[in-house]
A protein has these predicted regions:
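Catalytic-adjacent loop/helix segments of enzymes that bind and process anionic phosphate/sulfate esters
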Residues: 1-53, 57
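Metal-dependent phosphoester-hydrolase catalytic domains
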Residues: 41-62, 67-140
Length: 140
């Protein structure tokens, strides 16, 4: 689980309706931008650590998790380098995994060593939390 944004209820309300303003009209946008910046820096460092562990592993890697970041992010591309993305192999559509805020975010991932064959990838559209579960069947 990589660093979350930690948006407050007010942050989320503002994102849903930007016409809402704070006392000075700038407090919510500033708060949101600060949280995005701080969490991005933390995810960058976390991604570097995860990548080092992947490279040290003497075994074929399967990596599953909530990246809290989108497919064009540093965390996603750095961690996923040289691995198979099970959604790309067998998923379909947008494949959103996060149900709050923007419903198009795919931030939960399953990556595998290329020696695995991806039989199927499924996103279960059941709201058990603010994320939809994802499942991949892999064959070695």
């Amino acid at each position: 689980h990589l660093q979350t944004l930690r948006f407050s209820k007010n942050n989320k309300r503002y994102i849903d309706d930007p016409s809402i303003t704070g006392d000075d009209g700038l407090s919510e946008p500033r708060s949101i931008l600060e949280k995005i910046k701080k969490s991005d820096i933390k995810r960058h460092h976390q991604a570097d650590k995860v990548r080092k562990e992947i490279e040290k592993s003497p075994y074929p890697v399967i990596l599953c998790g909530d990246f809290n970041d989108v497919p064009n992010s540093y965390a996603y591309t750095h961690i996923g380098k040289g691995l198979i993305n099970t959604f790309v192999e067998k998923g379909s559509g947008i494949g959103n995994t996060f149900s709050d805020l923007a419903s198009t975010l795919r931030i939960d991932n399953i990556f595998s060593d290329p020696r695995f064959h991806v039989e199927q990838y499924i996103r279960i559209k059941k709201r058990l939390s603010d994320h939809y579960p994802v499942v991949a069947d892999l064959v070695y």
